[in-house]
Structures are given as structure tokens and as C-alpha cells.
């Protein structure tokens, strides 16, 4: 059993990926998320001097990302990765996916 975590920046690609996973009987939980960089740009914490000027000129408007958690059997994992790669045209810098082993679960 594996926990597959995926974050995709492009909303349309994320939704297409979810539809593809759902079509193959895979379910999960979706959270709205944002990158650490964007979260810090919008924080009230004073940035270190080296980053202060950069953060002043960068736009604070950003589109949030979405993160999905899917609990998959080992035999579903590679298929799920193929669905993700297909819908994101290779993922690249558009997001990230990783897995964590799950030793037990209930529910």
C-alpha cells in the first residue's frame, strides 16, 4: 500500500488528472495548497535583506495549487503515475508527485 501525493499548479491539468484517476476507480482527498515561496511572499514576517528587495518587486497575486492524497495498492501505483504524466504532459516543473509506504490504515 502506498500514499501517492500529487501537486499540480495548472487547475485544468489537475482536474483532468483527477478525472483520469477516478475513471480507473482511484479515489483520494484534495486540499488547496500553495508553495512555500508564495506563502512567504504574502507573510507579514520581514524578509532577510537579501530577499527583501526581490519580494517587493514580485507580484503577490498567485493562483493556488491543489494537492491530492491517494491511498493505492501497489498494483495501481504505476498506472496512476501514467495517468498523471499523460494529463500533465510529463509533469516537469508543473508540479510534483511522490509516494510514501503505508504500513497500516483503517476506514
List each language-model region with its residue ranges.
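Positively charged, small/polar-rich N-terminal and surface patches that mediate targeting and assembly
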Residues: 1-107
Amino acid at each position: 500500500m502506498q500514499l501517492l501525493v500529487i501537486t499540480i499548479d495548472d487547475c485544468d491539468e489537475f482536474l483532468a488528472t483527477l478525472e483520469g484517476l477516478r475513471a480507473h476507480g482511484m479515489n483520494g482527498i484534495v486540499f488547496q495548497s500553495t508553495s512555500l515561496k508564495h506563502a512567504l511572499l504574502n507573510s507579514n514576517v520581514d524578509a532577510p535583506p537579501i530577499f527583501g528587495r526581490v519580494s517587493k518587486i514580485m507580484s503577490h497575486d498567485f493562483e493556488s495549487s491543489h494537492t491530492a492524497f491517494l491511498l493505492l495498492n501497489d498494483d495501481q501505483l504505476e498506472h496512476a503515475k501514467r495517468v498523471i504524466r499523460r494529463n500533465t504532459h510529463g509533469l516537469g516543473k508543473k508540479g510534483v508527485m511522490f509516494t510514501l509506504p503505508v504500513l497500516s490504515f483503517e476506514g
